[in-house]
Amino acid sequence: MRFKELDGLARRGETPEERAYHDRRRAELRAALYAGIAIRDAREEAGLSQTELAARIGIAQSALSRIEAGRANLTLGTLQRVTDALGLPLKLGVGSHEVAIPAA
């Protein structure tokens, strides 16, 4: 389900529980989209095609395409493999707390 579909559901008069669910789902979709954009930008800066990066991290090009489009549930393991393949640290933050995991 995409943002527009969720927004349409929110306008139909929903219970507080349904609204909370849709708000959480929108936040999850937004996070996946932002992560995908960051991966795409880093891949392009490295001069790699989707096919090349996908091969380096052991997934299909189509799976990487879904990740970059924000349409995949990205695991920390996959994210670590991406940053390792690009020679970049993985930075994770929760509120004011941030940790940088160096590339392998």
Model regions: which residues?
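N-terminal flexible/basic segments that precede or flank functional cores
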Residues: 1-37, 99-104
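Short basic helix-loop element that most often maps to the first helix and adjoining turn
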Residues: 3-4, 9, 37-54, 81
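Short amphipathic alpha-helix starts
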Residues: 32, 57, 92-93
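Recognition helix of helix-turn-helix/homeodomain-like DNA-binding domains
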Residues: 57-73
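The DNA-recognition helices of helix-turn-helix-type DNA-binding domains
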Residues: 71, 86, 97-99
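DNA major-groove recognition helix of helix-turn-helix/homeodomain DNA-binding modules
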Residues: 77-93
